[in-house]
Amino acid sequence: MSLLANRRFLKMHGAGNAIVVLDLRGTAVRVTPAEARAIAADVHSRFDQLMVVHDPVTPGTDAFMRIYNTDGSESGACGNGTRCVGYALLDDPAMARPAENGALTLETKAGLVAVKRITERSFTVDMGQPRLRWDEIPLAEPFLDTRRIELQVGPIDDPILHSPAAVSMGNPHAIFFVERDPDSYDLGRIGPLLEAHPIFPERANISIAEVTGRDTIKLRVWERGAGLTLACGTAACATVVAASRLRMIGRAARVALPGGELSIEWRADDHVLMTGPVYLEGEGTFSPDLFAGIDG
C-alpha cells in the first residue's frame, strides 16, 4: 500500500493555479512520479502543481519543498504554489508553526525562496535572481544574447511566432512577445511542440505575452509538465524580466493571466518579487484506492 494513503492534503489555488499542499514533515516518505500522476488524475485532488513539504535541509530555513507537475516530473520553482505553502505554514491549524513577522524561508532543489504575508490572503515571494546565461537556463546551443533566441513557429518567411526571450526562474521559460491578444494564438497546439523542442534540453515553459502598457502585460502560459494553465507565477516573473531587458517596460508590472493578476518587481539587487493572492478551497485525505497497484 502507498504510504500516502489516508494522508491529509489541502486544496488551494493562487490566481487560478490549482495547488495541492501535502505535509510530509517528520516522515521519510517521498512521493513517487506514479503517485503524483494518480493524485493529479483524481477529481478530488486534481492539481497543476503538487507542493510537498518536507523537513528543512539547510539550517535557518523553515521547510524543504518538492514540486511535482501533473505528469509526475519535478520542477525547481512554482511561485503560486509557494504562496500557498506560505499560507499553509502560517495559518493552517495542522501545519502552522511560529514564524517571525509572518515570514518564512523555504528551500527547493533550485535554491531558497522567501515568503512574506502582505494581507490575510496576499503573499509576496522573493523568487531570487533570474538566470540569463544560455547554459544556466539551459539551452542546447550557445546564445550570447538570450533576450532573443532563434526559434520560430510557422513558415520561415511568415512565422506565427518567432524570436522568444529565454529566462530561468529556477525552471526554463521561453516568452514570445506579440502585438495582438495572446488568446488569439492556439497555445494548446503550439505549447507542447515547443516545450519539447531540442533547443530546451530540460523542456521549457512556453508563454505568449502582449505588453499592453508601460506597466501592464497580458500573458498566456503552456506550463512544462502540466499544459495550459490559468496562471504561472514563474512565467509572470520571467516575462517581466524579459520585457524589462528589451526595454518594453520598466522593472515592475502587473501581469494579467486568465486566473487573475500578479504584481512582479525586478529589484535593483536583481531579485524578483511576486505578489499575489491565495485561496483555500478545502481539505481531504487520499483514498487508499487512489494508489491501487502503486508501491509506495
Swiss-Prot record:
Task: Identify the taxonomic lineage of the organism of origin.
Answer: Bacteria, Pseudomonadati, Pseudomonadota, Alphaproteobacteria, Hyphomicrobiales
Name this protein carries in UniProt: Diaminopimelate epimerase
Instruction: State where the protein is found.
Output: Cytoplasm
Which gene is this protein's source? dapF
> Its biological function?
Catalyzes the stereoinversion of LL-2,6-diaminopimelate (L,L-DAP) to meso-diaminopimelate (meso-DAP), a precursor of L-lysine and an essential component of the bacterial peptidoglycan.
Record site: Could be important to modulate the pK values of the two catalytic cysteine residues: 173, 223
Family named by the database record: Belongs to the diaminopimelate epimerase family.
User: Which species does this protein come from?
Assistant: Methylorubrum extorquens (strain PA1) (Methylobacterium extorquens)
Name the reaction it catalyses: (2S,6S)-2,6-diaminopimelate = meso-2,6-diaminopimelate
What Pfam families does this protein map onto?
DAP_epimerase
Q: Name one GO molecular function term.
A: diaminopimelate epimerase activity
